[in-house]
């Protein structure tokens, strides 16, 4: 059995503090260390009376300095960190620390996901903790981390992550996971802070971030920035074979392996502006005709169909219906066709749709009209379809919108079709950026372009399920891993532009 040190964060609630100390002594720890501000005489007397080791913090000390001093002073093989604002029974604490004191685990986390009810909306903290574990390829940890008290660490873990780990606890959690320490998160103690239990008014949407939330967000971004610096801009997530090489070559010389010029019309409904419709396709012979017929209803100057990896009649059907055809025999990878279509487009308004299901002309018109009226990126407003439990793809979309302080966009994203874009926005962010939709969205936001969710179109029910991409027996399917990677790539760019990459640290 390993020896135990318990470190208590001081409490303003003196009675609960004393009760907590008495419960903790029943665990037979080597010591109890408590952080006490030197102007809180009553707390000092309680700690002294109960034979605690006291770490005094003067008014110039930071919370982190007090924590570091406590960790350095600890003598036990295991360190248990508790918040004395909550009364925890001896029996609860004994069960909680059992895996680490019996050497079955190196780290014990509070299973807070037990208290985040399925029917409730997770707040910003929960979203970002979930995202951290996704980035670390540990989705099984859900939102559980050392950001929630209580938690317990073997002393050797603390030595490896550094005694000053509280200065960047986000990065510390990431290092714990990366270093392969054995983590147990099977026991739940209900000691959630107000921030952790706070419910948002809507599902993954809020009007604005508070100053406190912005400060927390900065800490998450700084932690992730160091991780990106260590692991690369996609931190190991696949891009599922996107042909970035083809995009690069087209940037140097616009030449397609196969090209057919189609026809269109000069529109009279966009105040003199002209519309290009871009449709990337692969083996969509059963649906492409209806897709094009609906697109014709909104008066496009051109419909550009980018065919890649097809072995059916998709290209011939689209050609018969007057579309401009760009054809590649090989698969280009997700979103590369969008980028190539944008390169070829000549319109003032660009509408992006998919070829595997049709969207009515009346629905499409909401997006093109919004851009005609001055919006630069008109997104599909998917918030009405959100219901708990939330899918990880919706969570990462919301996470990115939080990162650049646009929480009202919810899960609005260039990942989803339909969406439309202004010519000026495309020229500013670059057509090639569209191969990573989330990166394109970040660039547009940072450049000051108007990005709004304008209309709801259900793209879940009609979307064709591709088993190899959308289904997995273990973990996330390939499509989800690619989307997470795209969002991490977008975060990488955002962090670099905000100069939060930590390179000066």
Question: Which residues fall in each region the model found?
Answer:
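A conserved acidic beta->alpha catalytic loop
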Residues: 36-43, 307-315
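Short, acidic, metal-binding catalytic loop of nucleotide-sugar glycosyltransferases
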Residues: 22-30, 293-301
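Cell-envelope/extracellular polymer assembly enzymes that use nucleotide-activated donors
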Residues: 3-5, 171, 274-276, 302, ...
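Short aromatic/hydrophobic "clamp" motif used to bind/position activated sugar donors
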Residues: 79, 350
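Glycine-rich, basic loop-to-helix element that forms the pyrophosphate-binding segment
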Residues: 60-74, 328-345
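Acceptor/aglycone-binding surface of glycosyltransferases and processive sugar-polymer synthases
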Residues: 94-152, 365-423
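C-terminal catalytic/acceptor-binding lobe
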Residues: 178-266, 270, 446-505
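N-proximal low-complexity "stem/linker" segments adjacent to membrane-targeting elements
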Residues: 1-22, 243-293
């Amino acid at each position: 059995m390993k020896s135990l040190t318990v470190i208590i964060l001081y409490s303003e609630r003196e009675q609960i503090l004393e009760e907590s100390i008495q419960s903790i002594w029943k665990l037979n720890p080597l010591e109890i260390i408590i952080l006490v501000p030197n102007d809180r005489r009553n707390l000092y007397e309680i700690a002294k009376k109960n034979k605690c080791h006291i770490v005094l913090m003067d008014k110039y000390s930071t919370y982190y300095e007090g924590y570091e001093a406590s960790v350095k002073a600890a003598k036990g093989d295991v360190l248990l960190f508790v918040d004395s604002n909550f009364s925890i029974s001896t029996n609860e604490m004994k069960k909680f620390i059992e895996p680490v004191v019996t050497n079955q685990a190196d780290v014990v986390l509070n299973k807070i996901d037990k208290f985040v009810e399925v029917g409730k909306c997770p707040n910003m903290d929960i979203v970002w903790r979930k995202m951290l574990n996704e980035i670390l390829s540990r989705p099984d940890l859900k939102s559980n981390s050392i950001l929630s008290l209580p938690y317990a660490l073997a002393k050797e873990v603390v030595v490896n992550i550094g005694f000053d780990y509280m200065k960047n606890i986000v990065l510390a959690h990431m290092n714990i996971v990366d270093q392969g320490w054995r983590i147990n998160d099977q026991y739940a103690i209900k000691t959630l802070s107000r921030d952790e239990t706070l419910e948002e008014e809507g599902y993954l949407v809020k009007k604005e971030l508070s100053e406190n939330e912005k400060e927390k967000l900065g800490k998450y971004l700084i932690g992730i920035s160091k991780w990106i610096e260590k692991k690369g801009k996609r931190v190991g997530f696949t891009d599922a074979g996107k042909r970035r090489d083809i995009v690069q070559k087209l940037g140097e010389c616009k030449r397609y392996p196969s090209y057919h010029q189609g026809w269109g019309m000069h529109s009279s409904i966009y105040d003199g502006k002209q519309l290009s419709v871009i449709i990337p396709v692969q083996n969509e012979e059963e649906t492409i005709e209806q897709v094009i017929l609906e697109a014709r209803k909104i008066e496009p100057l051109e419909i550009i169909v980018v065919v890649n990896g097809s072995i059916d009649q998709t290209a011939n059907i689209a050609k018969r219906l007057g579309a401009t055809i760009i054809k590649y025999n090989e698969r280009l990878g997700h979103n590369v066709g969008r980028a190539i279509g944008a390169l070829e487009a000549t319109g003032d308004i660009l509408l992006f749709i998919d070829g595997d299901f049709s969207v009515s002309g009346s629905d499409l018109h909401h997006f093109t009209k919004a851009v005609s009226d001055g919006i630069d990126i008109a997104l599909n407003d998917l918030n009405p379809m959100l219901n708990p439990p939330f899918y990880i793809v919706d969570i990462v979309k919301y996470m990115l919108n939080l990162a650049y302080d646009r929480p009202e966009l919810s899960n609005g994203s260039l990942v989803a079709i339909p969406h439309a874009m202004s010519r000026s926005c495309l020229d500013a962010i670059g057509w090639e950026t569209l191969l990573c939709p989330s990166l394109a969205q970040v660039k547009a936001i940072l450049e000051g372009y108007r990005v709004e969710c304008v209309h709801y179109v259900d793209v879940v029910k009609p979307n064709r399920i591709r088993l190899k991409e959308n289904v997995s027996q273990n973990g996330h399917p390939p499509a989800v891993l690619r989307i997470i990677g795209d969002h991490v790539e977008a975060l990488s760019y955002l962090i670099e532009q905000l100069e939060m990459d930590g390179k000066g640290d």
